[in-house]
Amino acid sequence: MPASASPSIAGLLLAGGRATRMDGVDKGLQLLDGTPLALHVLSRLSPQVDETLISANRHADRYAELGAPFDARIVADETPDFPGPLAGLLAGMRAARAPLVACSPCDTPYLPADLVARLQAALDAQQADIAMAVTVDAQHVRSPQPTFALLRTSLADDLAARLAAGDRKVRAWYARHKTVEVEFHDERAFYNANSWQELAALARR
């Protein structure tokens, strides 16, 4: 993209959580096959977007180092109490130069290579505010994946108001806006690590 061009989609890596089920470690910095989880995700997400942001509330210098090959910028929550992914999303929406933000957790190393394109196609086709991934397994069970989404940055003020009111649930906030669900049939692409056991399992997949 030429330096003078305006980016159309920002990618946002959500790495600002507390990882309470992993003894509070910084999940994105844990290694899979010798590489930090966050770098696995950045390597898949950044080629799909025009600018890259990393939501990180700890170890900002380390994330800046990981993000340097992608010209990533670091953003932090506006509040210090780790209020959850919506706070990271808000920080990214505020910082983005693009009108759309595509978000992904930092612990999903098999992120689909066509995630953003498919979300954008659905968003445009339905003239929606938010496009959210949904996995469908072999038994046709649908599982929403709300932290894999494409959102309009114009929603930032509403999100800020809901966070100020104490709302923390991602899907509850999505329900306030026109949201389209996009089905993905490759469950493996959305596997993540919420525990040490799941991190070990990722290495075996």
Curated annotation (Swiss-Prot):
Binding positions (GTP): 14-16, 27, 77, 107
Top-level taxon of origin: Bacteria
Keyword vocabulary terms for this entry: Cytoplasm, GTP-binding, Magnesium, Metal-binding, Molybdenum cofactor biosynthesis, Nucleotide-binding, Transferase
Annotated localization: Cytoplasm
Keyword Cytoplasm: yes
Catalysis performed (reactions): Mo-molybdopterin + GTP + H(+) = Mo-molybdopterin guanine dinucleotide + diphosphate
Quaternary structure note: Monomer.
Purpose of the protein: Transfers a GMP moiety from GTP to Mo-molybdopterin (Mo-MPT) cofactor (Moco or molybdenum cofactor) to form Mo-molybdopterin guanine dinucleotide (Mo-MGD) cofactor.
Free-text note on domains in this protein's UniProt record: The N-terminal domain determines nucleotide recognition and specific binding, while the C-terminal domain determines the specific binding to the target protein.
HAMAP family, per the entry: MobA
Family: Belongs to the MobA family.
Name this polypeptide is given: Molybdenum cofactor guanylyltransferase
Protein species of origin: Burkholderia lata (strain ATCC 17760 / DSM 23089 / LMG 22485 / NCIMB 9086 / R18194 / 383)
The organism's taxonomic lineage, starting at the top: Bacteria, Pseudomonadati, Pseudomonadota, Betaproteobacteria, Burkholderiales
